Every structure is written in C-alpha cells, then in structure tokens.
Amino acid sequence: MTVGKSSKMLQHIDYRMRCILQDGRIFIGTFKAFDKHMNLILCDCDEFRKIKPKNAKQPEREEKRVLGLVLLRGENLVSMTVEGPPPKDTGIARVPLAGAAGGPGVGRAAGRGVPAGVPIPQAPAGLAGPVRGVGGPSQQVMTPQGRGTVAAAAVAATASIAGAPTQYPPGRGTAPTPVGRATPPPGIMAPPPGMRPPMGPPIGLPPTRGTPIGMPPPGMRPPPPGIRGPPPPGMRPPRP
C-alpha cells in the first residue's frame, strides 16, 4: 500500500490512540502500523469494557485488562482518537555517532604477521644455532650461483681444506709419524697413501730364521686347509 507523507495516519504513528469497537470495548495503546483495510497494530495496549449489573439499582462498572501487543480488525473499528503524545525513549542503548568523543584508547585493525618496523628478536649467543660456515660448507658454496661457479667454488673449498698447512709447536719442524705406520728403512720405498703394506714381517726386519717359505710369521693364524698362504716377500704371486 502506497501512502503519502501528508497522510494523517502516518502523522499519528507512535501516539497513544483510543480505539472504540462496535461492541463498546475501548482499546488504548501505542499506534505502530496500519494497512488499507484499517487493520491496526497497537503495543502496550489496555482493554476497557463496561459490565452491566444484574440489578437495575446497581451502577455499571468498568473493567480493565492488560493485553500488550494487539491486532485490531478494521471491520470492527468505529472511531479512533488521540489519547496522548508519543512516550519518551528511556533506557534504550543507542549506537554512538562517528563524530562523538571517544575514550583515551586508540582503535586499530588487527594485523597479521610481524609489522615492518618491528625488529625480529634473536636468540642469545649461547643458545643460537651454528653459524653458517662453521662445521659445514663455507658461505660461498651455500650461496646460489651458476652451475659452473658452484662446482668451482666447491672444488676450491675442498682444496683449501685439504691443503691447509698444519701449525706445529716451536722446536718441531716436521709432522709426527702417523700412529700404526712404521718408517721404512733406507733404500725401501714406502707404499703410496691409501694402500695396505705387503703381508709378511714388518718393514725393515728380515724374515726370522727357521720360518719356512710361504708360512705366516709368528703371531699370525695360518690359512685354512686347501688355501695357499701369501707369497714370500719379493716374489710375485702365480697367475691363475
């Protein structure tokens, strides 16, 4: 239903209205809505009706009933008059306006992650993990570079680690002899690094007299039956 702004019904919205029905009952409530059939909605409504006495000598008495929210049918409505102005809004919480004065706090949006200007906390020196380059490859090897550059850097790092000179205490100009390796006598070449020395007596000592050729030196277990022992020193093993 389209109603103009100058309608009298709209001007009485939220007023206390007195509505009289055909049967004589009176409804007084706050006028909230209506339609084209004059159906009304009243809130905080009270009903007043007159009760006739049984005897003619007794006067009529009026009875009041509290109804609350009421829907009145327009076909039963006889008259409608203003009972009072709209009630004042008391105790209703309203949303504060944007320009209203606020409190001492500052409203900020909840951010995600670490802000750009805040420094990242670091662990103490004693609790931090190993530094890059200590106990592992150097920083040059770990830095992403081209294929050839990475391979060259890795070879250079390995060579620098393998060929680094060892510092010895003063007074000792040569490196100590490795444990478990005997110094060969003059005139005998030592085996190259990584190769086992030949089987037999220790280097620099002649074979013991009384030991037959092909028998293991004292202190070593003989080979199992059916397996020939190692050849004597200075002889090449037979070809299969």
Curated annotation (Swiss-Prot):
Q: Where is this region: Disordered?
A: 165-240
Q: Where are the transmembrane segments?
A: none
Q: Where is the composition biased (Pro residues)?
A: 183-205, 214-240
GO molecular function (one): RNA binding
> What Gene Ontology cellular-component terms does the record carry?
catalytic step 2 spliceosome; cytoplasm; nucleoplasm; U1 snRNP; U2 snRNP; U2-type prespliceosome; U4 snRNP; U4/U6 x U5 tri-snRNP complex
Per the record, residues carrying Omega-N-methylarginine are: 108, 112, 147, 172
- Sm domain residues are 4-86
Where Dimethylated arginine occurs, the residues are 108, 112
For the biological process aspect of GO, one term held by this record is: mRNA splicing, via spliceosome
sequence repeat spans: 175-181, 191-196, 216-221, 222-228, 230-236
CDD domains with a match to the protein in the record:
Sm_B
Superkingdom of the source species:
Eukaryota
Sorted alphabetically, the keyword list is: Methylation, Nucleus, Repeat, Ribonucleoprotein, RNA-binding
List every position bearing Asymmetric dimethylarginine: 108, 112
Q: Chief subcellular site?
A: nucleus
Please list where the region (Repeat-rich region) is annotated.
175-236
Assembly and partners? Interacts with TDRD3.
**What's in the misc comment field?**
Encoded on a bicistronic transcript that code for two proteins, SNRPN and SNURF.
State the name under which the record lists this protein: Small nuclear ribonucleoprotein-associated protein N
Species, as recorded: Bos taurus (Bovine)
By which gene is this protein encoded? SNRPN
